[in-house]
Amino acid sequence: MLDLSLIMLGAGNSTRFGLQSKKQWLRTGDDPLWLYATKNISSNYLFKDVIVVSNECEYMRKFSSHFKFIKGGETRQDSLRNAISNINSEFVMVSDIARADIPKELITKLIESAHNADCIVPALKISDSVIYQNEYINRDELKLIQTPQLSRTNMLKKALKTDNIFTDDSSAIKAIGGTVWYIEGDERAKKLTYKDDLKRLNLNSPSNDIFCGNGFDVHAFKEGDFITLCGVKIPYSKAFIAHSDGDVALHALCDALLGAASAPDIGELYPDNDSKFKDIDSKILLQNSVNLIRSIGFDIINADITIIAQSPKISPYKDAMAKIVADILGIPLHKVNIKATTTEHLGFIGRNEGIAANAIVNLKYFNWRNVL
């Protein structure tokens, strides 16, 4: 049996993909694509180690305890270098999470060919005519290189000890004099690069699950002349004691969004001991939170916010608040509700020592089929 480990690369930003969600976070059923792709390959062989490379490692750990997670780098090569330093098996198979439909037959052919060269590479023949700088070139001399590629670990480690940039493992190994063996590739292993590529993948639609999140925040008062709630400045004889602008309503909303997605909370993402968040406009924090949950495959359904304050009166500002929130969340105005209540002069809120807010949000998976 081959002493073999698996590395799945998925630290890219999906800049060419053209959808709100990173491709690795598109859902097929309840699984994000990175998990689906990793399980698809790892189920076909008893790999010594399975390493997933990502920029969302802590979040990914919630989805599986069977894999190791390594932080990605600036480039594919940096990410691979980070991962392979944790590999001690004789051979390593490297694939891209963007190749989600790798067939079992291709994995088998790679493993059977492992001893033929330093790197085993699936490649497709080109059937169309090819032109380069207005000159037709012989397509029979060209190949489309795919992953996964299977390499001798020591050779790949050696090949990565360079500042030269390579787009795949085989070219790096070839550059140091290593040998490469080509096997027949598979159309099903083509890379998911643009959103239209989704049409050829045999993937289930996202599940119809709904995810509810709840957020709560409170801030005490100090002397001042206004407070900010849901992005609206309200004239008042006090101000919030806070590291940011103290917008309790938007802070609660941020936590509700993050909680529904089971993501890190507002204190972890925007700590109050970080100077870059000093006096920050909380609308920026909310926009960052929205961008995050969308990038990991969620859509926002609705938001319901309750502001708990003895004073000032909130009613005159509710419409302006709702519009700001709806614009940032990217949902219709009728799906945002702002409410206000008092504590009937009870407790610290009743004594006008501060204000609290509670927010509830519902999310669903981004349905990529609707944009094809």
Curated annotation (Swiss-Prot):
Record's catalysed reaction(s): 2-C-methyl-D-erythritol 4-phosphate + CTP + H(+) = 4-CDP-2-C-methyl-D-erythritol + diphosphate; 4-CDP-2-C-methyl-D-erythritol 2-phosphate = 2-C-methyl-D-erythritol 2,4-cyclic diphosphate + CMP
InterPro entries xrefs: IspD (IPR001228), IspD/F (IPR026596), IspD/TarI (IPR034683), MECDP_synthase (IPR003526), MECDP_synthase_CS (IPR020555), MECDP_synthase_sf (IPR036571), Nucleotide-diphossugar_trans (IPR029044)
GO molecular function: 2-C-methyl-D-erythritol 2,4-cyclodiphosphate synthase activity; 2-C-methyl-D-erythritol 4-phosphate cytidylyltransferase activity; metal ion binding
Region listing for 2-C-methyl-D-erythritol 4-phosphate cytidylyltransferase, in residue ranges: 1-210
Pathway as given in its UniProt record: Isoprenoid biosynthesis; isopentenyl diphosphate biosynthesis via DXP pathway; isopentenyl diphosphate from 1-deoxy-D-xylulose 5-phosphate: step 2/6; Isoprenoid biosynthesis; isopentenyl diphosphate biosynthesis via DXP pathway; isopentenyl diphosphate from 1-deoxy-D-xylulose 5-phosphate: step 4/6
Stretch list, region 2-C-methyl-D-erythritol 2,4-cyclodiphosphate synthase: 211-372
Keywords of this entry: Isoprene biosynthesis, Lyase, Metal-binding, Multifunctional enzyme, Nucleotidyltransferase, Transferase
Cofactor(s) demanded: a divalent metal cation
Residues with site note (Positions MEP for the nucleophilic attack): R139, K191
Residue numbers binding 4-CDP-2-C-methyl-D-erythritol 2-phosphate: 217-219, 243-244, 265-267, 270-274, 341-344, 348, 351
Domain of life: Bacteria
GO biological process assignments: isopentenyl diphosphate biosynthetic process, methylerythritol 4-phosphate pathway; terpenoid biosynthetic process
Gene3D superfamilies, sorted: 2-C-methyl-D-erythritol 2,4-cyclodiphosphate synthase (3.30.1330.50), Spore Coat Polysaccharide Biosynthesis Protein SpsA, Chain A (3.90.550.10)
Free-text function comment from the UniProt entry: Bifunctional enzyme that catalyzes the formation of 4-diphosphocytidyl-2-C-methyl-D-erythritol from CTP and 2-C-methyl-D-erythritol 4-phosphate (MEP) (IspD), and catalyzes the conversion of 4-diphosphocytidyl-2-C-methyl-D-erythritol 2-phosphate (CDP-ME2P) to 2-C-methyl-D-erythritol 2,4-cyclodiphosphate (ME-CPP) with a corresponding release of cytidine 5-monophosphate (CMP) (IspF).
Name of the protein described by the UniProt record: Bifunctional enzyme IspD/IspF
Source organism (scientific name): Campylobacter fetus subsp. fetus (strain 82-40)
Gene name of the record: ispDF
